[in-house]
């Protein structure tokens, strides 16, 4: 690590900006690829319940590789780990373009994403510290959500024009992310020299799980972020089903526009969290989490496009304000106890287990014929109750 990298902890340093650009392109590819592949499934006449299964194979890769990716992120320069991971995403997207089964290609993208996540968040704690870390997380989330905004819309719009063109655009985005990773300064590995025996890595990972779960602050963060991202990915698929039922619109683009409104809102909410919430005042984000569920239930009852846009914008704002402080809390506390890479890998296990569970329940509800509006109302109410229970639990733990 160069001395300049050691001392320059500004969130506008060359290293931080390189990370943000690489993250934007990688997240753009992820989101465009999802909607392009969903369009491909439609053209190949897959049933509706198979759509969430596509995301389930993606998150299944996260869960399967969770014991190993944290150590990989901490054992090598994180910028190089990000580059290899984006290379795997590129291979998966290119495979789908060339006719590989979309579920197989998307699984490969999931493996790349699993390796990428601990490195992309872990590197923030190596490039900046303290309350700047909350701001860096806000910048990372804003970049990610901008990519979700543009990637989702690009994927849907291009797929309406030509599905293969949309898939090629995704592959090009991943290629750009690989190139951007080359400009990230090569940092010293956080925890080199660890054992690479699978049994030892598995024990080390589950030991990190235990350490983080026993700490009240990190347990609170793990549960909160798991609930949020599990709900978020389910909402994306709910929109695909809800739009033709509630609005009578059957194209690929409209669900992506609605998802984009959530993305815009998260950018605003993330910025507000960076200014209003510190590591010492994380509990300020909890009312926003409860309101997410309430607004989702109200949204599900809409039958016009304009109020749907407004409510999804509000859901995004609440979501950004809710999740950014929880991410920063876990990174700061986790870095000191088990290493940033391991902390994020444990977080990924929790988030993706929640996604797998929620997507499985959603797919089952669709399979048995539950109406989309009823799914949305039930989903919102249950989410609000879950966050309220988490807040009560956290306050009781803090009082002991």
Swiss-Prot record:
Record keyword Cell membrane present: yes
One cellular component term from this protein's GO annotations in UniProt: plasma membrane
Subcellular location: Cell inner membrane
A Pfam entry, by short name: MFS_1
Transmembrane parts of this sequence: 19-39, 53-73, 91-111, 139-159, 164-184, 195-213, 227-247, 257-277, 281-301, 304-324, 352-372, 373-393
GO molecular function term, any single one: lysophospholipid:sodium symporter activity
Listed InterPro entries: LysoPLipid__transptr_LplT, MFS, MFS_trans_sf
Membrane topology summary: Multi-pass membrane protein
Keywords: Cell inner membrane, Cell membrane, Lipid transport, Membrane, Transmembrane, Transmembrane helix, Transport
Domain of life per record: Bacteria
Keyword Ribosomal protein: no
Family under the similarity heading: Belongs to the major facilitator superfamily. LplT (TC 2.A.1.42) family.
Reported function: Catalyzes the facilitated diffusion of 2-acyl-glycero-3-phosphoethanolamine (2-acyl-GPE) into the cell.
HAMAP family, A to Z: MFS_LplT (MF_01585)
Name of the protein described by the UniProt record: Lysophospholipid transporter LplT
Organism: Salmonella heidelberg (strain SL476)
């Amino acid at each position: 690590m160069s001395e300049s990298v050691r001392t320059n902890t500004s969130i506008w340093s060359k290293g931080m900006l390189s990370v943000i650009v690489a993250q934007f392109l990688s997240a753009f590819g992820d989101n465009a690829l999802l909607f392009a592949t969903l369009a491909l499934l439609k053209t190949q006449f897959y049933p509706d319940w198979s759509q969430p299964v596509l995301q389930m194979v993606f998150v299944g890769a996260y869960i399967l590789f969770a014991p190993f990716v944290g150590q990989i992120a901490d054992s090598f320069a994180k910028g190089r780990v990000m580059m290899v991971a984006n290379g795997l995403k590129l291979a998966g997207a290119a495979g789908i373009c060339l006719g590989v089964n979309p579920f197989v290609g998307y699984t490969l993208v999931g493996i790349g994403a699993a390796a990428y996540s601990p490195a992309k968040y872990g590197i923030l704690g190596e490039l900046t510290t303290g309350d700047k870390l909350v701001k860096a997380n806000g910048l990372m989330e804003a970049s990610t959500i901008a990519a979700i905004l543009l990637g989702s819309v690009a994927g849907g719009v291009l797929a309406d024009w030509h599905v293969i063109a949309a898939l090629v655009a995704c592959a090009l985005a991943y290629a750009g992310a690989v190139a951007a990773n080359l400009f990230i300064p090569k940092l010293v590995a956080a925890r080199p020299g660890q054992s690479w025996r699978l049994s030892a890595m598995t024990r080390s990972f589950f030991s990190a799980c235990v350490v983080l779960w026993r700490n009240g602050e990190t347990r609170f963060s793990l549960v909160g972020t798991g609930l949020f991202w599990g709900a978020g990915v389910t909402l994306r698929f709910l929109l695909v089903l809800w739009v033709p039922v509630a609005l009578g619109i059957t194209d690929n683009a409209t669900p992506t526009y609605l998802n984009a409104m959530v993305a815009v809102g998260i950018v605003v909410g993330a910025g507000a969290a960076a200014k209003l919430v510190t590591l010492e005042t994380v509990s300020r984000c909890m009312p926003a989490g409860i309101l997410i569920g309430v607004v989702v239930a109200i949204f599900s009852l809409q039958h016009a496009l304009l109020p749907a846009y407004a409510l999804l914008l509000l859901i995004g704002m609440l979501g950004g304000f809710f999740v950014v402080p929880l991410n920063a809390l876990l990174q700061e506390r986790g870095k000191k106890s088990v290493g940033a890479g391991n902390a994020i890998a444990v977080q990924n296990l929790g988030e993706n287990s929640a996604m797998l569970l929620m997507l499985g329940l959603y797919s089952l509800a669709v399979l048995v014929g539950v109406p989309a509006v009823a799914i949305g109302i039930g989903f919102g109410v249950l989410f609000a109750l879950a966050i309220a229970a988490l807040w009560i639990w956290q306050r009781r733990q803090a009082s002991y």
